[in-house]
Amino acid sequence: HTTDGVETHRDCAPKWSSRMLEGDNLLGSPSCTAYLNGTYLGMDDQIKLLIDTELYHRMRMKHGMPFILDDVLIANREHNNRVSAGGVDYDATISDSSRTWLVNKAEIEHIYKKHSDYFVTRKYPDET
């Protein structure tokens, strides 16, 4: 992440999170991703905050685990006009054994309803 385009902070190599669909995004923003021609599934225009993680989930469901480069190659600029910086009501939290993150309750309910089949087992087709 960077605020000035020069200095970086919170550097982290991307990785898949077991709670990705619920907003535990350790991959980064969509600008950190690339897709083979003809594979991109588009974004759900009913959500703002979870728009990227929901896309990553659908892509994995259809195409399998993405290839992830274990290196810091991109710095996202942080600024006050980011979608996640304003215009989203963070009114709920989700926790697992190691982290807690903020979410929008209406969006997470949309996710739980839209992907209810996934939440039965929390398994992807590429997992045994």
Q: What positions do the PLM features span?
A:
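Conserved nucleotide-sugar donor-binding catalytic segment
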Residues: 2-4, 8-97
